[in-house]
């Protein structure tokens, strides 16, 4: 009996192994929650948990409006991902693993080697992420880390190459 090839293995072999990304995951298009992920860990940290980069239970943050009034807002990370695709922007950013990523842009029907994808790009200090709607009701989440000599452009190409593979396999 052949060993089952898991999403984690597939993400690792096709994305993480390129060294163009520091992490990759798949989220459901229904709720935006990441259900499979891989990440480059710190070799010096035996307690590294890849999930800490991709998921955190709902939590509250304090936000300040233009008048300086502080209020509490509950963050549901999956919903912050869905807002990007449903609304075309994310005024409160995209949150993943408790980290806020500033929304940069969304490209609808971006053509890549014969396939079209909706692609969103978000940034944080010295890194960022790409969100790509892929066939099968999934959203590909790709992280890049400039401190690991990764950049927005090359990580986006790696994400789109993987998205193309998924599109080809779903035909």
From Swiss-Prot:
Residues 5-10 are annotated as: Pro-rich sequence-binding. SUPFAM superfamilies: Profilin (actin-binding protein) (SSF55770). InterPro entries: PFN, PFN_euk, PFN_sf, Profilin_apicomplexa. GO terms for biological process: actin cytoskeleton organization; cytoplasmic actin-based contraction involved in cell motility. Signal peptide: none annotated. The record marks 89 as: Interaction with actin. One of its GO terms (molecular function) is actin binding. Coiled coil: none annotated. Residues 100-112, 152-156 are annotated as: Actin-binding. The keyword Cytoplasm applies. SMART domains: PROF. It is found in: Cytoplasm, Cytoskeleton. The record marks 35 as: Interaction with Pro-rich sequence. GO terms for cellular component: actin cytoskeleton; cytoplasm. A motif (Plasmodium-specific profilin mini-domain) lies at residues 48-54. It holds the Pfam family Profilin. Keywords: Actin-binding, Cytoplasm, Cytoskeleton, Lipid-binding. The actin binding residues are poorly conserved between Plasmodium and other organisms. The Plasmodium-specific profilin mini-domain may have a role in binding to membrane phospholipids. Belongs to the profilin family. This is Profilin. It comes from Plasmodium falciparum (isolate HB3). The lineage of its organism: Eukaryota, Sar, Alveolata, Apicomplexa, Aconoidasida.
